[in-house]
Amino acid sequence: IFNEPKSQPWTEIREYANQIIAVIRQYSDNLILVGNPNWDQKPHVAIGNEVEDPAHNVAYTFHYYAGTHGKWERGNAEKAIKGGLPIFVSEWGTGTADGKGTPDPEKNQVWQDWMDEYKLSSANWSASRINEGSAAFANESTLDTLVFTPSGELVKSFLAKNPDTYEACATK
């Protein structure tokens, strides 16, 4: 709900999310992802003022680009996690937030280690052939022949390290 709010305050995002959650819960108890201020980089602002979900199945989103973001953004997410909020990294990229530049393996490894430490689920940007540094596939890729970009190769190497079995998380 509300992907990448730019400058809206949490109170406004929360009010909107509560209305949408009430409608969704009439039909489904599936996980709902809720955005937060500054392009989903301030999930900690929801501590003590969480959205209302009768199914207790909400996660707060977090976005980063390894070439742009660092310790400050990780700190915001860590505050949220330590404050008891479930976090889902619903967008991360290997390059810069503007889509330019090339992946920095060292900065990306710092972020991957951080996600592993907190056992965070994530979705990488972008499994596409778009003309930007974070695209996973080169323009010559086809459905039959995938050609990975440097970003795609890096993401593929991270995904290859994922566990093949999982444990259920503790619930409140």
Task: Show the residue positions of the predicted features.
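Extracellular glycoside hydrolase catalytic/binding regions
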Residues: 3-121, 125-129, 134-163, 168-170
